[in-house]
Every structure is written in C-alpha cells, then in structure tokens.
Amino acid sequence: MELKIGNKTYNIEYSVEASLCDDCVEKVTNFMMGMANVDGVDAKKFVIGTMTNLPITALGMLYGGLMAHHGEDGDNTVTCLADAKKLLKQYIVDHKEDGTGNYYDIIGILIDQMGKDGFFDIIGLTKMIEMGQTKTPKKPTDHKKKNNAVTEK
C-alpha cells in the first residue's frame, strides 16, 4: 500500500520486518486483544483507555509498516520512531480535508493493510485468538468424593 505524506509516497508493508518490530507487534496485539475482549468491560473505561492509546498505537503500527521499504533494509529514510512520528504528524496535517487525518482512521487503514499482508498470521495473533475462542470449559479433575467418615480405632 502507498501513503502520500508530504511530497513523497511511502510504501507500507506488514511482513517479516514489521513482525520483528517489537513496538508494532505490542501495539497491534494490545489493540486487537482489547477489541476482542469488550464483553463485560465497563464501556466508559474501555473507550477512555482506547482513545488515550490511539496516538501511540498508530505510531507503533506505522513504524512497523515502514520498515520493509524505508528501514535498514530499504531506503533507510525511517530508522527510528522519531522518523515515523514526523511522518505521522505530517500525514495528519496533509489529510485533514479527506477525513483520514486522525488516529482512528489511520489505525483502520493500517489494520486493513495488515490483514491484506497476512501480518496477523505472521505474528501468531490469528491463532492465539482462535485458540481463545475454542477453549472448552474446564472440568473438575477430582471426581472422587471425600471420605468424611471418621475411622474408629
């Protein structure tokens, strides 16, 4: 996927390089697991917690997506989070008019690309979520009744 930021086009790809970016994997995993576990959560706390994390989540996700083409193995224009932060800031300024210049939409765009690139499978998130959904209820292992009878001597 290509993102136009400033006067340059950046290629976003979620492949092995992104999966090796701890910040990206941590942010997307926390975000996706949080969204998957909304049941039984205080809605107000969930919304506030999610909203306060959107900027840093978007930054970590963007940084990971830039690694393949613009990191050490690419053109070397994005070598740290500070570089990605400048691009994120510029993207928000550039895209206010088209409606995608906000953290929520940026995350949506990036998650969509992650899905297309198979990123969730690469990092094991798909399998982890599937395992959580197919868990069978635990059965008690102690099926014997306790002998409460007092033995006489």
Model-derived regions: residue spans:
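Short linear motifs in exposed loops
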Residues: 13-15
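A contiguous binding-surface segment within folded domains or other stable secondary-structure elements
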Residues: 19-57, 61-63
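Short, hydrophobic/amphipathic alpha-helical patches that form generic packing surfaces
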Residues: 56-68, 105-113
